[in-house]
């Protein structure tokens, strides 16, 4: 997966999302080094077993037009190299730079921010025209962008059902894209144990605490029964992906635990495309 686009448009968020899904990632890689990078990662490993994500942009200081030639050569060797291009409106980019107080990569040329954005659009146009998908992030927040990357690009082939298990805090709202929503607030709350309060549902202490609660076992078994019954039917209905969300008060303990537990069960059941996303933690 090749990730490119305008500075401030969400490329770093996309790369971090791929990394969280066990892609081997490299950012700011010059195009001329891309063939050697891919060869080094594939050496001794079947092509189908490797998931790579590479960030390429104006910082690469290389001839971006070379990318088309490399992608064509890679395809002949059975390597699928998809190019995602992230962009946003000038207004959105200017606001993001104002909020973060970061400098634009082209500011060293003595350009004001609007001029730097315009210049970057010109420099990256060869990449945009090659892109398999152009993603406008002007109206997306970080959580929405991560979810879109996971569901539309990171999980793989669309001829099979991809599962995303998500945790969230009810006080911040239910994820609009969720297909199934389960309320984990009925479960015992580790928050009230001072030793467990700083931890999350991914930590062993919280897992052990909840694993030993009878209500948690009963709750989990009933959800497993529901998902094992209906997810195969959704796959037969040609769905590409399903989001299963678990909510609790703070999105830190119970919801995270349940999302991780159900994702683990799905992998054990043989579902090939499974990911987790913890909205309040990631």
From Swiss-Prot:
Molecular functions per Gene Ontology: ATP binding; GTP binding
Domain of life: Bacteria
UniProt entry tagged with the keyword Nucleotide-binding: yes
Coiled-coil region: none
Entry binding sites for ATP: 5-12
Pfam families assigned: PapZ_C, RapZ-like_N
Keywords of this entry: ATP-binding, GTP-binding, Nucleotide-binding
Amino acids binding GTP: 57-60
SUPFAM superfamilies according to UniProt: P-loop containing nucleoside triphosphate hydrolases
Known role: Displays ATPase and GTPase activities.
HAMAP family referenced in this protein's UniProt entry, alphabetically: RapZ_like (MF_00636)
NCBIfam families: PRK05416.1
Protein family: Belongs to the RapZ-like family.
Protein name (record): Nucleotide-binding protein XCV3122
Gene source species: Xanthomonas euvesicatoria pv. vesicatoria (strain 85-10)
């Amino acid at each position: 997966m090749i990730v490119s686009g305008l500075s401030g448009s969400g490329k770093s968020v996309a790369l971090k999302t791929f990394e969280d899904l066990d892609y081997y990632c490299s950012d700011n890689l010059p195009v001329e080094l891309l063939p050697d990078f891919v060869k080094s990662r594939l050496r001794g490993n079947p092509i189908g077993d490797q998931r790579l994500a590479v960030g390429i942009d104006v910082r690469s200081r290389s001839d971006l037009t070379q990318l088309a030639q490399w992608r064509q050569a890679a395809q002949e060797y059975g390597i699928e190299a998809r190019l995602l291009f992230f962009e946003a409106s000038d207004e959105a980019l200017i606001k993001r730079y104002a909020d973060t107080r970061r400098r634009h990569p082209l500011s060293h040329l003595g350009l004001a921010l609007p001029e730097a954005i315009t210049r970057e659009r010109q420099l990256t146009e060869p990449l945009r025209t090659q892109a398999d998908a152009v993603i406008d992030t002007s109206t997306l927040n970080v959580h929405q962008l991560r979810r879109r990357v996971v569901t539309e690009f990171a999980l793989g082939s669309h001829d099979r059902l991809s599962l995303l298990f998500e945790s969230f805090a009810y006080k911040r709202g239910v994820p609009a894209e969720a297909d199934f929503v389960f309320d984990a607030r009925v479960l015992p709350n580790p928050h009230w144990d001072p030793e467990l309060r700083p931890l999350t549902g991914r930590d062993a202490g919280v897992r052990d605490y909840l694993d030993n609660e009878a209500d948690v076992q009963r709750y989990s078994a009933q959800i497993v029964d529901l998902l094992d019954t209906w997810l195969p039917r959704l796959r037969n209905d040609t769905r590409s992906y399903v989001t299963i969300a678990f909510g609790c008060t703070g999105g830190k303990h119970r919801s995270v635990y349940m999302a991780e537990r159900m994702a683990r069960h799905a992998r054990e059941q043989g579902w090939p495309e499974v990911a987790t996303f913890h909205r309040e933690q990631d």
